[in-house]
Amino acid sequence: MVQADPAGAGGLKRRLGLFDAVTIGLGAMIGAGIFAALAPAAGAAGSGLLPALAGAAVVAYCNATSSARLAARYPASGGTYVYGRERLGAFWGYLAGWGFVVGKTASCAAMALTVGLYVWPGQAHAVAAAAVVALTAVNYAGVRKSAWLTRALVAVVLAVLTVVVTVCLTSRAADPVRLDPGAGATAGGVLQAAGLLFFAFAGYARIATLGEEVRDPARTIPRAVPVALGITLVVYAAVAVAALAVLGPTRLAGAAAPLAEAVRAAGTPELVPLVRAGAAAAALGSLLALILGVSRTTLAMARDRHLPAVLAAVHPRFHVPHRAELAVGAVVAVLAATADVRAAIGFSSFGVLAYYAVANAAALTLTAAEHRPPRAIPVIGLAGCLVLAFALPATAVVAGAAVLAAGAAAYGVRAARGSA
């Protein structure tokens, strides 16, 4: 059984309650889905965007349930890296952790670039790198400050999205005919869109990876995960309906800033600056929570010597994995200077779907005494993760599989040397 290190012995300090955990998950999910994944998903699914959203939500719910039960059983930082290791063996835990770290590092770059593209399109890469540096400093100063800032960002974003949905759905430009999922949608396109939209739902992983910093994790994590996921699904569905109603799938797919285009089409161009500000706030919230979660999984893997042991240090004053956070921040800052947003989303989705496939497989091994979920939930989650992963664009599948294979090969080399 995994034991969380006590805060006074090199471990992390339990500061987060239910509301903090929910807002960290919301901050990670809402920014990613609404402002980054909606347009490419519409491009893949066309008029089948809403069924794709529903499919992604089903898989996300199964993953969330499996993750919550496992997190209650193993309340240590690392998420599925820990669950896979304890339930399936060291290799599967390592593979899950590797998929999470590389996939979510790509997510960080995508969110940083989203900030840059909305704040200052002509200097997007510079703004993205600056955002990474600033938020890494916030996380370094302590997770409690991160939780408060995330709470403020979530409130701003939800207010902006409420305005967008209201304006679009009450506009004369809204046409319910555009919501018909039967016009030109294909099964392959819907599955690919679901895989891209899954990128948006994956924020609840941040709640599980904060296992050592949540008060009463056995109760808090299983409650926080479905609450955050449910709120996010309602928000996504409302925004997707509003955007489709005024733009239609073709125009939505081609929009560089789809929600800004939606309010313009609804006859309220004066709201475009507000939407751009909301997009930047959403992406900042996602980036803040992403850096937080990736650094905690890096910490867990470093403790087990699957990553350099120097990254396992916890700051004696701030009680955060400061070296892991600085390393993650440095890598993301470099990627933000070179990455393409849409390619990063596909790559990230593949890695994170692999991560949750391991989580569902691990949940299948829980006993009734360990509060095992109904068997259908991890089975559907596992199958759904595999189907959506290989339905992604070919470049994302090839790149993601290659990186996972490289990680597996590195593990094999270490095992052969007797150090795995």
Task: Annotate each PLM feature.
Residues M1-A37, A44-G48, A60-Y61, T65, ...:
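Membrane-interface "cap" regions at the ends of multi-pass membrane proteins
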Residues V2-L12, L50, A54, R151-A277, ...:
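Helix-loop-helix junctions that connect adjacent transmembrane segments
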Residues L135, L149-A152, L311-H322, L353-A399, ...:
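C-terminal membrane-solvent junction of multi-pass transporters and transport-like membrane proteins
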Residues V82-Y83, G89, P121, P226-I291, ...:
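TM-loop-TM module centered on a large, flexible mid-protein loop between adjacent transmembrane helices
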Residues I34-L38, M111, V138-V143, L252, ...:
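Transmembrane helix-loop junctions in multi-pass membrane proteins
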Residues P40-G43, A52, Y61-Y140, V154, ...:
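Hydrophobic transmembrane alpha-helices that form the core helical bundles
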